[in-house]
């Protein structure tokens, strides 16, 4: 009898020790794209149990473009997601009720790629050409701004729907003339196209709005502020840890996504660090949406793309959940 009591107590102790410290709230987090180096901090924090320790059961869903992520979060299909901020502003004007809570790309990651042998030298040469990318790609939403900023008609190009993984093949086969991609996989285009690679960073062409930010469905945020506060603080800490020591961070990403290669994603991550750093992320807080920049981005979208309905830009973002002591290194 005594032995059974001891065994029962031991089993109960083991069960208690292995139970989560907090009841776990599931969060379905949709990415802007398939997992890559830029998503490493989420996988790192999840692997180390940082989210679970705060009562968050984080489910990371691969995405198919910022536009889709914005739509799903705006509609409440996903409570939280990752999307390009310019597209988020456009969607807000159409009624999508989302709030940005953490900025990842302080600099625009958008880039245009082509073959130099095609004769294209810059944006003005895109007129009459075919640009290929997925239908829900954030670059399509922002294209009118880039075109108008460079003095060409946004409708002067033809958009071709292709899968993300087919961009390079389509470019090489010359079934498209130009494609779009984020700067953090610039090294892949360099490797595949070599000296024939033509490239233009949007941030060097008069267009540098905030890039990817974490957005939350407004109604979900209203009822789950404590959860989002914990999520943001863990995520901010994870990004800072990955900047300081990227190797284990990238390894966590690769461990969770078997098809990825460490060397490729490590290079990807180092380019992400470039995109994360601006005056405000270095001096105010990593992840901040600075008021002046957000106002300028709103005016840019309003002028070049148009908003179905004007709104107060401060309604689409908040910095309240950030730890102001965590900054990008100077």
Predicted regions and their residues:
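Short, glycine-/small- and polar/acidic-enriched structural segments
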Residues: 24-173, 177-184, 200, 208
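N-terminal secretory/targeting leader peptides
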Residues: 85, 195, 201, 255-258
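Periplasmic-binding protein-like
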Residues: 104-114, 194-220, 228, 232, ...
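Secondary-structure end/capping motifs
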Residues: 223-306
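Conserved C-terminal helix/tail region of periplasmic/extracytoplasmic solute-binding proteins
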Residues: 294-330
